[in-house]
Amino acid sequence: MRIAIGCDHIVTDEKMAVSEFLKSKGYEVIDFGTYDHTRTHYPIFGKKVGEAVTSGQADLGVCICGTGVGINNAVNKVPGVRSALVRDMTTALYAKEQLNANVIGFGGKITGELLMCDIIEAFIHAEYKPSEENKKLIAKIEHLESHNAQQTDANFFTEFLEKWDRGEYHD
């Protein structure tokens, strides 16, 4: 199984720990970064993880930022992604079994590394349990997806990053 993983600069260490855990379990990890603590932007990494999952490059995705809120919102903008921000096993299993989630999101400063690893392992092994009801719910969710042709451009974030480098944006 191939698992895409991405994070922002706030949780690089946590992502590396999760990545090493997954590798130790025999999973192929596709690490989209970030790889250090240099200030960066979570939408970039959420987009990369989401695109890897929806293109078939990865089977599942894991997104981590400080609270998990930002990167999870970003990855959910990729058409075909169904990501759940979780902090507990029950929510993660519900997301996979009932909503066929293909990405899982965490707040790396909220949820500890060991718990994240346990939840991810359970998420990987959980199976979607299709029913007429949840098929209809998933179809309604998919109907809400917005397809932005610009989003598939490899340079989608270039202008934003150039403005950042010029000091036009601030934290």
Curated annotation (Swiss-Prot):
InterPro entries: LacB, RpiB_LacA_LacB, RpiB_LacA_LacB_sf. It is an enzyme of class 5 (isomerase). Coiled coil: none annotated. The keyword Transport does not apply. Its EC number is 5.3.1.26. Pathway: Carbohydrate metabolism; D-galactose 6-phosphate degradation; D-tagatose 6-phosphate from D-galactose 6-phosphate: step 1/1. Gene3D superfamilies: Sugar-phosphate isomerase, RpiB/LacA/LacB. GO terms for biological process: D-allose catabolic process; galactose catabolic process; lactose catabolic process via tagatose-6-phosphate; pentose-phosphate shunt, non-oxidative branch. GO terms for molecular function: galactose-6-phosphate isomerase activity; ribose-5-phosphate isomerase activity. It catalyses: aldehydo-D-galactose 6-phosphate = keto-D-tagatose 6-phosphate. Keywords: Isomerase, Lactose metabolism. Heteromultimeric protein consisting of LacA and LacB. NCBIfam families: lacB, PRK05571.1, PRK08622.1, PRK12615.1, rpiB_lacA_lacB. Belongs to the LacAB/RpiB family. This is Galactose-6-phosphate isomerase subunit LacB. The lineage of its organism: Bacteria, Bacillati, Bacillota, Bacilli, Lactobacillales.
